[in-house]
Amino acid sequence: MLERIKVCFTESIQTQIAAAEALPDAISRAALTVVQSLLNGNKILSCGNGTSSANAQHFAASMINRFETERPSLPAIALSADNVLLTAIGNDRLHEEIYAKQVRALGHTGDILLAISTRGNSRDIVKAVEAAVTRDMTIVALTGHDGGELAGLLGPQDVEIRIPSHRSARIQEMHMLTVNCLCDLIDNTLFPHQEV
């Protein structure tokens, strides 16, 4: 058992090192894209399933409340946070539409959709991205593995942050770190003189 624990930590560290080499440009581009959208008076919608939903909600909470420093609230909505709405849509046998319907109702030109999917193939996330495209929104996608179907939907203005791993647990860990990194970069760009 002790050896298994060491393997988990070693794999996580190796994935972090690989991501630190591969992802800075994409993370920087994503942060600047979000900052520009916010400066233009737009908002961020975030979505994901399971652990990805938790990461999407963490991002929205960090935007509205704060990340590490006190600052004005920033407009963000976690589309997975309203259980009544999700079950109402899902009850009508439209599970694939649980996020797309919200994107069509709440998303506007210039808004950002933060779409988080470990493998990039979750039908409801893919449908949300398709809806965001029709609303002329910009997509920031957190994926892993080979990016899945989601990666193929992205245009030149969109940003994919693809974790260099095939293991779901490692991808999810790196998604959380990436969300924290995005929050830090957004805060430090918009409010450069705030103290931690």
Curated annotation (Swiss-Prot):
This is DnaA initiator-associating protein DiaA. Gene3D superfamilies: Glucose-6-phosphate isomerase like protein, domain 1. Homotetramer; dimer of dimers. Residues 34-196 form the SIS domain. It holds the Pfam family SIS_2. Keywords: DNA replication. Transmembrane segments: none annotated. It comes from Erwinia tasmaniensis (strain DSM 17950 / CFBP 7177 / CIP 109463 / NCPPB 4357 / Et1/99). PANTHER family: DNAA INITIATOR-ASSOCIATING PROTEIN DIAA (PTHR30390:SF6), SEDOHEPTULOSE 7-PHOSPHATE ISOMERASE / DNAA INITIATOR-ASSOCIATING FACTOR FOR REPLICATION INITIATION (PTHR30390). SUPFAM superfamilies: SIS domain (SSF53697). HAMAP family: SIS_DiaA.
